[in-house]
């Protein structure tokens, strides 16, 4: 029953995120960088109807906003922004819970598009045991011509139970890790990027 309830929550969150059919990416200069992609992503409303943000997006948005202003992060938050690598990592640790947001982007093989990825994961007392309410691994394809990004099927079958995903800071492959109930690593595999999708 608990698994079913969590699945329903995840579906609801997925549907809400799917409402962001197309996101305009605003930037200065000749091309957007990772901060431009991330900021456009977190400032796009969860719902076209109510225009509100969920709790997780609000936390990430606040962290990015403070970074953009050159201000200190809230207590328990750390942020890593590597513009050269096209990678951002935000970590929040509160009361034994750790929220991790990873974002990255790179050029697709045809050079007409870029892939933007965002991964949100929750762990408790250092253990990755099941999905948090806002967990998700989402992909968007950015169109260099229209300067917008839309939801993209990158070929990844996402599973959130005892599974974690590590987005690349270098390279273009995703590391998938399965964890046992006691929080120990059981196995790892690599999702290989082929220029347009991931292969298992």
Give, region by region, the residue ranges found by the protein language model.
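Bacterial Sec-dependent N-terminal signal peptides
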Residues: 1-22
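Mid-length scaffold segments of soluble, non-membrane domains
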Residues: 109-153
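Short, solvent-exposed loop/turn segments at conserved positions within beta-propeller repeat blades
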Residues: 30-33, 81-84, 130-134, 182-186
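Terminal domain-start segments
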Residues: 20-106
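Short beta-strand segments that buttress and anchor functional surface loops
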Residues: 89-92, 117-123, 175-181
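Short, surface-exposed coil-to-beta transition loops
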Residues: 97-101, 116, 126-128, 132-137, ...
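Short aromatic loop motif centered on NTY/YTY
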Residues: 148-200
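Structural signature of eukaryotic scaffold interfaces centered on beta-propeller domains
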Residues: 102-111, 164-170
């Amino acid at each position: 029953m608990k698994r079913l309830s969590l699945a329903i929550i995840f579906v609801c969150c997925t549907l809400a995120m799917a409402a962001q059919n197309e996101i305009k990416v605003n930037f200065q200069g000749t091309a957007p960088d990772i901060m431009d992609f991330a900021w456009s992503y977190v400032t796009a409303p969860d719902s076209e109807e109510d225009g509100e943000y969920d709790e997780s997006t609000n936390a990430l948005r606040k962290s990015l906003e403070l970074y953009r202003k050159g201000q200190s992060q809230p207590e328990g938050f750390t942020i890593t922004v590597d513009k050269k690598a096209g990678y951002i990592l935000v970590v929040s640790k509160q009361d034994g819970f750790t929220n991790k947001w990873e974002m990255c982007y790179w050029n697709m093989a045809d050079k007409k598009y870029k892939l933007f990825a965002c991964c949100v994961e929750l762990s408790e007392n250092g253990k990755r045991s099941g999905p948090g309410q806002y967990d998700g691994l989402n992909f968007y394809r950015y169109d260099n011509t229209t300067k917008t990004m839309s939801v993209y099927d990158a070929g990844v079958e996402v599973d959130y139970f005892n599974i974690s995903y590590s987005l690349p800071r270098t390279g273009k492959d995703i590391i998938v890790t399965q964890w046992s109930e006691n929080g120990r690593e059981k196995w790892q595999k690599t999702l290989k990027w082929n220029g347009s999708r991931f292969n298992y």
